């Protein structure tokens, strides 16, 4: 009985000793992991305090964004800002990204849960190759746990690159809400003040004769300008903040018309406005040719010019519509 008791005591002692020996490396590894994580967070916080958007090369990206351990998310903008790249959209997107990062850095809700970083192609081309990335700018959220999923890549062509739109996307992916605070822009109030001053000056100069306020042609022209601006998608641009155009970084080809029906470029708005204006001018000429008291020769010229404008610009408008709504069966002169 005593021998059996000694056997059990020795067995229990050996098991406990074995567990302690095995736990020592595990605890040591855990402490080392926590130290590495603490160093990474401290480094990121130090850089963020100096500059809200951290510039990264390949080494920094692999060490601080890709390599574990990590308990923070990193929003990375992949871009090409060097002048010889001639990426106008990259500069515009960078300005919005800086506004967003500054809004987060100087907000009362600022924590180390999320950081903003930037990788320029000329400083980290190996990162672009590692991620098989062939366009810029691109925004990707690298979450605290796991690899980026499909939704962690920002849909720039659909949402645009305004700071407010990127902030909504970040809130969806990280549950971190950022209130965008833009620096004051005095251009709008100045233009409004100038417009009011001009109108006030005209009213003052013509105070003895106010018939110009009831001029049908003036009001019709103002209404037409407003309609052309609204039907061309100007309000959509104001809300979404899309890029002016898109330049392929590899071929250098510039696209002014977006290939999807869910988005558009600012240049596309100007083109559509021009085409609508051309059709409108053609219709006005046709109406004048039919109702004017001018001689028959001038009326014929106006009629031919009006038909030409309507046919040409409507055909161009329809071709743009076909390029955006794939499968649309109808065309006119141009496919």
Curated annotation (Swiss-Prot):
<keyword id="KW-1003">Cell membrane</keyword>
<dbReference type="GO" id="GO:0055085">
    <property type="term" value="P:transmembrane transport"/>
</dbReference>
<keyword id="KW-0225">Disease variant</keyword>
<feature type="topological domain" description="Extracellular">
    <location>
        <begin position="322"/>
        <end position="335"/>
    </location>
</feature>
<comment type="subunit">
    <text>Accessory component of the STT3B-containing form of the oligosaccharyltransferase (OST) complex. OST exists in two different complex forms which contain common core subunits RPN1, RPN2, OST48, OST4, DAD1 and TMEM258, either STT3A or STT3B as catalytic subunits, and form-specific accessory subunits. OST can form stable complexes with the Sec61 complex or with both the Sec61 and TRAP complexes. The association of TUSC3 or MAGT1 with the STT3B-containing complex seems to be mutually exclusvice.</text>
</comment>
<feature type="transmembrane region" description="Helical">
    <location>
        <begin position="271"/>
        <end position="291"/>
    </location>
</feature>
<keyword id="KW-0256">Endoplasmic reticulum</keyword>
<feature type="topological domain" description="Cytoplasmic">
    <location>
        <begin position="292"/>
        <end position="300"/>
    </location>
</feature>
<dbReference type="GO" id="GO:0005886">
    <property type="term" value="C:plasma membrane"/>
</dbReference>
<keyword id="KW-0460">Magnesium</keyword>
<dbReference type="GO" id="GO:0015095">
    <property type="term" value="F:magnesium ion transmembrane transporter activity"/>
</dbReference>
<protein>
    <recommendedName>
        <fullName>Dolichyl-diphosphooligosaccharide--protein glycosyltransferase subunit MAGT1</fullName>
    </recommendedName>
</protein>
<dbReference type="InterPro" id="IPR036249">
    <property type="entry name" value="Thioredoxin-like_sf"/>
</dbReference>
<dbReference type="GO" id="GO:0016020">
    <property type="term" value="C:membrane"/>
</dbReference>
<dbReference type="GO" id="GO:0006487">
    <property type="term" value="P:protein N-linked glycosylation"/>
</dbReference>
<keyword id="KW-0472">Membrane</keyword>
<dbReference type="GO" id="GO:0005789">
    <property type="term" value="C:endoplasmic reticulum membrane"/>
</dbReference>
<feature type="domain" description="Thioredoxin">
    <location>
        <begin position="47"/>
        <end position="175"/>
    </location>
</feature>
<feature type="topological domain" description="Extracellular">
    <location>
        <begin position="231"/>
        <end position="270"/>
    </location>
</feature>
<dbReference type="InterPro" id="IPR021149">
    <property type="entry name" value="OligosaccharylTrfase_OST3/OST6"/>
</dbReference>
<keyword id="KW-0900">Congenital disorder of glycosylation</keyword>
<keyword id="KW-0732">Signal</keyword>
<feature type="signal peptide">
    <location>
        <begin position="1"/>
        <end position="29"/>
    </location>
</feature>
<keyword id="KW-0325">Glycoprotein</keyword>
<feature type="transmembrane region" description="Helical">
    <location>
        <begin position="210"/>
        <end position="230"/>
    </location>
</feature>
<comment type="function">
    <text>Accessory component of the STT3B-containing form of the N-oligosaccharyl transferase (OST) complex which catalyzes the transfer of a high mannose oligosaccharide from a lipid-linked oligosaccharide donor to an asparagine residue within an Asn-X-Ser/Thr consensus motif in nascent polypeptide chains. Involved in N-glycosylation of STT3B-dependent substrates. Specifically required for the glycosylation of a subset of acceptor sites that are near cysteine residues; in this function seems to act redundantly with TUSC3.</text>
</comment>
<dbReference type="GO" id="GO:0018279">
    <property type="term" value="P:protein N-linked glycosylation via asparagine"/>
</dbReference>
<keyword id="KW-1015">Disulfide bond</keyword>
<dbReference type="GO" id="GO:0035577">
    <property type="term" value="C:azurophil granule membrane"/>
</dbReference>
<keyword id="KW-0813">Transport</keyword>
<feature type="topological domain" description="Extracellular">
    <location>
        <begin position="30"/>
        <end position="184"/>
    </location>
</feature>
<feature type="transmembrane region" description="Helical">
    <location>
        <begin position="301"/>
        <end position="321"/>
    </location>
</feature>
<dbReference type="GO" id="GO:0005783">
    <property type="term" value="C:endoplasmic reticulum"/>
</dbReference>
<keyword id="KW-1133">Transmembrane helix</keyword>
<dbReference type="GO" id="GO:0015693">
    <property type="term" value="P:magnesium ion transport"/>
</dbReference>
<feature type="glycosylation site" description="N-linked (GlcNAc...) asparagine">
    <location>
        <position position="71"/>
    </location>
</feature>
<dbReference type="GO" id="GO:0008250">
    <property type="term" value="C:oligosaccharyltransferase complex"/>
</dbReference>
<comment type="similarity">
    <text>Belongs to the OST3/OST6 family.</text>
</comment>
<comment type="pathway">
    <text>Protein modification; protein glycosylation.</text>
</comment>
<dbReference type="Pfam" id="PF04756">
    <property type="entry name" value="OST3_OST6"/>
</dbReference>
<feature type="transmembrane region" description="Helical">
    <location>
        <begin position="185"/>
        <end position="205"/>
    </location>
</feature>
<feature type="topological domain" description="Cytoplasmic">
    <location>
        <begin position="206"/>
        <end position="209"/>
    </location>
</feature>
């Amino acid at each position: 009985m005593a021998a059996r008791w000694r056997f059990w005591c020795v067995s229990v002692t050996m098991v406990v000793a074995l567990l302690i020996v095995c736990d020592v490396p595990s605890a040591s590894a855990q402490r080392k992991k926590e130290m590495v994580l603490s160093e990474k967070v401290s480094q990121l916080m130090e850089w963020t305090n100096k500059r809200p958007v951290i510039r990264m090369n390949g080494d920094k990206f692999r060490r601080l964004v890709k390599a574990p351990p990590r308990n923070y998310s990193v929003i990375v903008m992949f871009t090409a800002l060097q002048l010889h790249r001639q990426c106008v959209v990259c500069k515009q997107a960078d300005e919005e990204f800086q506004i967003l990062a500054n809004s987060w850095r100087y907000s009362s809700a600022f924590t180390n849960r999320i950081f903003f970083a930037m990788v320029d192609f000329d400083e980290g081309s190996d990162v672009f190759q590692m991620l098989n990335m062939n366009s810029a700018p691109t925004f990707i959220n690298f979450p605290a746990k796991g690899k980026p999923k499909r939704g962690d890549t920002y849909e720039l062509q659909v949402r645009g690159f305004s700071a407010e739109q990127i902030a909504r996307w970040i809130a969806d992916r990280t549950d971190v809400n950022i209130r965008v605070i833009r620096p004051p822009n005095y251009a709008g109030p100045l233009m409004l003040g100038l417009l009011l001053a001009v109108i006030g000056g005209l009213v003052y100069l013509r105070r003895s004769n106010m018939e110009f306020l009831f001029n049908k042609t003036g009001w019709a022209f103002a209404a037409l300008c407003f309609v052309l601006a609204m039907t061309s998608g100007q309000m959509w641009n104001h809300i979404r903040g899309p890029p002016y155009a898109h330049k392929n970084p590899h071929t250098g080809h510039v696209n002014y018309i977006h290939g999807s029906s869910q988005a558009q470029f600012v240049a596309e708005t100007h083109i559509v406005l021009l085409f609508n204006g051309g059709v409108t001018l053609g219709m006005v000429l046709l109406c004048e040719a039919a109702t004017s008291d001018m001689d028959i020769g001038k009326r014929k010229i106006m009629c031919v010019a009006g038909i030409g404008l309507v046919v040409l610009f409507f055909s161009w408008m329809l071709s743009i519509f076909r390029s955006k709504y794939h499968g649309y069966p109808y065309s006119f002169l141009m496919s």
